[in-house]
Every structure is written in C-alpha cells, then in structure tokens.
C-alpha cells in the first residue's frame, strides 16, 4: 500500500459512504441478504453513517469475494465487498466494535465468526440452489427477474454453476439435506451455548461485537425471507436465546433508527466513481461471454456425441 492510500485509511469516516445491494423485495437471494444484513447491522452498531443503494447489478460492481461478493461498500476511493473486508476497513478507520475486549476474547470471537459465516452461508447456498423447490420457486425467479429473456435464463445458468462450484470447494455439494440441517442445528447449538455464558444481551456482555452482527444477519435472513421450504426457519426458531438476540438487534438498530432516511433509489445519486461505472458497463459483456462459453461447450458435447 502506498503512502497516499495509507493516509486515506487514517482519515475520518467519509460522509458519502454508499452500500450497494440487490433489490430486497424482488431480487436479493438468501445468502446475499444475510451478508448485507450483517454489514448493515455492524455499521449501525458502530453508529456510522451510510446510504443504502439498491440496484440490479450490485453483484457485478463487486471487486471480488470468496462467497457472496455482496454487499459492496464505496467509501471515497475505496471499494470493498463482503462482511470481513468491510469490517477490516472499518477497523483501519478506528471505528470498530470490540476495542474493550481482551485479546483472547477477540481470538475466540473470530473463531465463532468464521464458524457462523462458513456454516450458515454454505447452508443458505445449498438450500437455495440444491433444493429443487426452493430453486424453482424462489432462487431462479428472483435471480433472473432483472434481466429480459433469454438473459434471465443465462444469468440463472451462470449463478447455479457458480453456486455448485463453491459448494464443491467447501465439500457441501454432495451432502444430503438432513446432513445440511444437522450442521445448521449444531452451529446454532454452539452459538446459543456461547450466548448463555454472557452476562449481558450480546455474546460478550452489554456491548455488541462483529459476532452479534453476523449471527443476526444470517439468522434474521432465514427467519424473514419467505422460502418455500421452511426447514432452516424451523431450526432457528428452536433456539430461543438466539431468537431473542435477533429481535433485540432488529428493534434497537433497524426499527428505532428507521432506514427510510438512508435508502435511496437507483436514480437519486449519479455514479461518479470511475471503478463503479466501469464495472457497471461490463455487466452486458460478462453475461455475453459466459453465454458464449456455455453455448460452445454444449456444441462441442453435441459434436462428440454425433461422432
């Protein structure tokens, strides 16, 4: 990192921070919603100002990521995506939660954060893409809703292939649904046991930390999105302490501080950032390239079968 970038990191929190995400009502998927909720909860817990901007191509604005690629945070000249990189940026700004925690507590907390993110994100992706009813009735319609035919079909094909690849990397793709639900249940048991040890409302006492934010993001997403299959929701509802935590965070940080003043439409703020604009313009090219690769692969398979 050069000297100018280092100095920018040390500057105060910018006033024009924008959080990009897909449309909540029509488009956002389960795992994406969980990640976006977790980031919003963390920023609100830090009492940091930001604007929420919903747009159809939020995923294509992302500079990268190892799971959902969302949300995308633009803070001045910096662009970050997903929960951990965004939280690390907040820490560099000196605005993070948990400064009061001991070092061993921070290390322990990061272990719980990793467990939560890896287990619940994979479970959300599995339910969304590997359970046929959920995919047909929820995932595919929402993922393709912002694209005209046949781009919606192409986009669904690309998204399904990406999800299966990620599930394969984490060795979740070939699991049975009962194995997935067992892992979710075990994760919730571990989290509830940790919450029971706390003397306060949150995992580490009377003040929130990033574990509270990420647990809220995933569990509240499972509870609030209307999936055709309610297996995940039923599991979460068994853990009363976790349910209580989610409802408290929702009321304290989302209901009391209405998001209406923070939400902005896609046309209310121009895209002045060159990197964001460039990524937006690349959307059509990306979809076209993926479509051509899929077409050529299918054509080659047909030729091989004929031979």
Predicted regions and their residues:
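GST-like domain detector, emphasizing the conserved glutathione-binding G-site
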Residues: 1-157, 203, 276-300, 307
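Short amphipathic alpha-helical interaction elements and helix-loop-helix interfaces
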Residues: 23-25, 45, 49, 79, ...
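A diffuse structural propensity rather than consistent per-protein peaks
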Residues: 81-82, 209, 272
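GST-like fold's C-terminal all-alpha helical module
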Residues: 122-247, 307
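Pan-eukaryotic secretory-pathway lumenal catalytic ectodomains of glycan-active enzymes
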Residues: 237-307
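Acidic carboxylate-rich catalytic motifs and surrounding loops in phosphoryl-/glycosyl-chemistry enzymes
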Residues: 52-59, 206, 259-269
């Amino acid at each position: 990192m050069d000297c100018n970038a280092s100095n920018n990191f040390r500057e105060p929190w910018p006033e024009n921070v924008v959080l990009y995400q897909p449309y909540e009502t029509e488009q956002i998927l389960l795992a994406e919603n969980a990640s976006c909720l977790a980031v919003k909860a963390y920023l609100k817990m830090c009492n940091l100002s930001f604007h929420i901007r919903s747009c159809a191509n939020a995923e294509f604005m992302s500079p990268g990521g190892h799971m959902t690629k969302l949300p995308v945070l633009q803070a001045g000249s910096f662009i970050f995506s997903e929960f951990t990189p965004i939280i690390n940026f907040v820490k560099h700004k000196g605005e993070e939660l948990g400064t009061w925690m001991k070092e061993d507590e921070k290390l322990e907390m990061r272990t719980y954060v990793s467990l939560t993110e890896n287990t619940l994100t994979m479970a959300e992706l599995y339910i969304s893409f590997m359970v046929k009813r959920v995919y047909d009735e929820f995932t595919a319609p929402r993922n393709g809703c912002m694209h005209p035919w046949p781009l919606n079909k192409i986009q669904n094909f690309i998204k399904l292939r990406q999800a299966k690849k990620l599930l394969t990397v984490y060795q979740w793709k070939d699991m049975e649904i009962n194995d997935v639900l067992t892992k979710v249940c075990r994760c919730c048991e571990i989290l509830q046991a940790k919450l029971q040890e706390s003397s306060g409302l949150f995992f580490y006492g009377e003040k929130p930390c990033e574990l509270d934010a990420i647990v809220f993001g995933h569990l509240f997403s499972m509870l609030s999105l209307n999936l055709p299959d309610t297996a995940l929701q039923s599991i979460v509802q068994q853990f009363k302490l976790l349910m209580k935590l989610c409802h408290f965070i929702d009321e304290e940080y989302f209901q009391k501080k209405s998001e209406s003043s923070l939400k902005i439409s896609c046309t209310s703020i121009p895209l002045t950032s060159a990197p964001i604009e460039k990524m937006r313009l690349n959307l059509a090219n990306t979809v076209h390239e993926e479509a051509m690769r899929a077409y050529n692969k299918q054509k080659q398979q047909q030729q091989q079968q004929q031979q």
